[in-house]
Structure formats: structure tokens, C-alpha cells
Amino acid sequence: GLAVFHAKLKRVYETAIPLVESRVTTKGDQLQFIIPQSQLFEDGRDVLRDTRKELFSDVSQTLIKRSGVVPTDMEILINAGSELPTEDGIKDHLAIRRVHALVEAFLGQGTPARNIYVGIKPGKEKKVYFKFYIRNSYDNQFSKVGDQ
């Protein structure tokens, strides 16, 4: 069940990054990991550290297996610095490039795009938040324009 899924994810993250911070909501339905960006990326770049490949592979396998039983999603939230990027500066913004690299790493390991959600928030902490939660159904979360 859910407790086994959470325990497996905790083992995966804590094995890859021993000082990772984890939190479970009071209802026990969501699990969140908080990781310094420096543990995932090369300094000042959007290049993922080679030592993290197994983390992405193991998380992807765990999420895929769980989603086959219960629709489960992963949200990736990254701090963007003191201000969010402007429309003109999006493609050059480091936080945007980093969240893109994370998504590509998970997609490359087979995680379905429908199970990944991303967000960017202002903040100087330079952390990445990974949240895992159950979706209410297997239905698509969004519809194409015109499908309304």
C-alpha cells in the first residue's frame, strides 16, 4: 500500500543523498523530499551530476510500478531566486533550465509525462522539492483546447 510506496521512495532518496530532508503530510497521503540544488546539479549549471543517474532510474521504476496500481504523480518544485523569470528571460533562466533537465531525466527513465508536474517559486534557498501524491483517477488532468 501507500506506506510501502513511501518506505521504498525514502530508501531510494536516502541511499542516493544521505542528508535529504523528507516530510509526510499529517494525513499521510503525500511524501515530500527536499534536496539542495547543489546535490543534483553541477555548480551554476543545468547539468545533472553523473552520480545521480541511479536516483532517477530508481525513482522512475518505483513511480511506474506504483502508478500501475494507483494513479500516483510526482511534482517537482524549484526555487528560482529572488524573482520569477520574465517572459523574455524564461529560456535563459537557470531554474527553468534545471527543472527541464530534471523532467528530461525522469522521462528518459520511462516515467510517463502524465505523472510529472513542475513548478517554480521565488526563493533564495536553492532547493528542489519532490512531492509524491495519489491522483483521484486515471483521467487526464488537462484537456486539449476544444475538448471542453
Model-derived regions: residue spans:
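A generic short-segment signal for beta-strand/edge and adjacent turn/coil regions
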Residues: 1-5, 41-46, 86, 99-104
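Extended Gly/Ser/Thr-rich low-complexity repeat segments
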Residues: 44-54, 144-148
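Short, surface-exposed beta-strand segments enriched in small/polar/acidic residues
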Residues: 34-46, 62-95, 116-130
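Short secondary-structure junctions
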Residues: 11-20, 66-70, 109-113
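Periplasmic OmpA/Pal-like peptidoglycan-binding modules at the C-termini of bacterial envelope proteins
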Residues: 92-148
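Extracytoplasmic juxtamembrane/flexible linker immediately downstream
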Residues: 1-30, 34, 143-148
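Generic alpha-helical secondary structure
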Residues: 2, 6, 49-56, 91-99
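Short, non-transmembrane amphipathic alpha-helical segments
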Residues: 49-66, 100-107
